[in-house]
Design a protein with these regions (language model features):
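Catalytic palm subdomain of template-directed nucleic-acid polymerases
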Residues: 1-29, 46-56, 133-140, 234, ...
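Divalent metal-binding acidic/histidine catalytic loops
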Residues: 52, 64-340
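Short, solvent-exposed loop/turn segments at the edges of secondary structure
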Residues: 2-4, 40, 196-198
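Short, conserved secondary-structure transition motifs
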Residues: 31-58, 88-89, 269-273
């Protein structure tokens, strides 16, 4: 027996898709054809006249606002926030801080924010992950950060991710890291995670974001170069399987591709030291302690399947995944990555 739910079929034209559905029905499979896709797993899908696709989740944002007891649109006095978080705020455990009053289900809100971030809203990835770190023992400062984020989401509820493929671009990945960004020199003993760095990366195909992540590193980096190199390694763990999948699809002549998929990956990083480490196999006394697992991608670089490129800090699209950024930077990166 085989049961499936919410399945998608994609093809170069509707005729082939309709034929597949007919063949499956002939095989006595109970299938309901819902027609052209408009909604999938809570994500609104709007195909526009210019060929772009707009993905958004306004209903989930409405649910978050309801859970926080925020008034509906146009009602009540709710201050608007134009950034997901305060640009100067770094959340910590704050063990001696004011207790959270329990006015909303913190864990439930975090679950909704995580789903929203992973599907359509990379602009909230950093602060959503930061708030999620304190789910077991949330404090008042963490609840305030969630409410700030909710006011930003209320202001941008109908926005999401705009996909507009650019045929001249293949697989690209932007990697950035914030070295020991949570470090609290006044109380390092209160939160051992403050010594950890955070990396973020965005994986794109034809200019469209596919995967993004904001992640606290498990290893303690000893320098900014190390933290960036760790970020490169983790990002390419996700990129390499994508490249292998594209290679198989190209080999099998998959009809879903109107043009042959590009198998080369460009990686963009703003740290020259990390790029040099990624390119060379030479023994280096200062980096010999790095785990061998971090070097897994070097053969791909040697073969030319992955090329490494220096990018300026302003053009580092993953910057807003590693720390709170100023409004001017947010607007620029959000337009570049999300299309609005």
């Amino acid at each position: 027996m085989l049961y499936t739910d919410d399945s998608l079929l994609a093809g170069p034209d509707n005729g082939e898709i309709e034929q597949i559905i007919k063949d499956l029905k002939k095989a006595k499979l109970n299938i309901t054809d819902e027609g052209d896709i408009q909604d999938f797993l809570g994500v609104n899908i709007d195909t526009r006249e210019d060929g772009s696709i707009h993905l958004s989740q306004p209903h989930l944002i409405d649910q978050i606002l309801k859970d926080l007891k925020f008034p509906a649109d146009g009602k009540g006095n709710v201050a608007t926030k134009v950034t997901p978080a305060k640009s100067s705020e770094i959340l910590k455990r704050d063990k001696d801080g004011r207790e959270f009053d329990g006015s909303f289900n913190y864990r439930s809100i975090i679950g909704k924010l995580n789903y929203l971030e992973k599907c359509t809203r990379s602009d909230i990835a950093y602060i959503a992950h930061q708030c999620a770190r304190f789910t077991e023992e949330p404090k008042d400062c963490h609840a305030k950060a969630i409410k700030w984020l909710a006011r930003y989401l209320r202001h941008t509820k109908d926005q999401g991710l705009i996909l507009k493929p650019q045929k001249n671009r293949g697989v690209e990945v932007y990697v950035d890291a914030d070295f020991s960004g949570n470090w609290d020199p006044e109380a390092p003993h209160k939160d051992r995670d403050t010594a950890r760095s955070r990396h973020g990366y965005i994986i794109m195909y034809e200019g469209c974001p596919m995967i993004w992540k904001s992640q606290l590193q498990t290893e303690i980096a000893l320098s900014s170069t190390e933290s960036e190199y760790i970020g490169i390694s983790y990002a390419l763990r996700e990129v390499i399987p994508i490249m292998e999948l594209l290679r198989e699809m190209k080999k099998e002549n998959f009809p879903i591709f109107k043009t042959k998929p590009k198998l080369h990956c460009k990686l963009f990083e703003d740290n020259s030291g990390a790029l040099e480490m990624a390119k060379t196999h030479k023994y280096r006394p200062r980096t010999k302690h790095l785990n061998v697992k971090l070097h897994h991608f070097r053969d791909y670089v040697t073969r030319g399947e992955i090329s490494l490129h220096k990018v300026g800090t302003k053009e580092q699209l993953a910057d807003y995944l590693t720390k709170p950024v100023l409004l001017e930077i947010l607007l620029y990166l959000r337009l570049k990555v999300m299309g609005w």
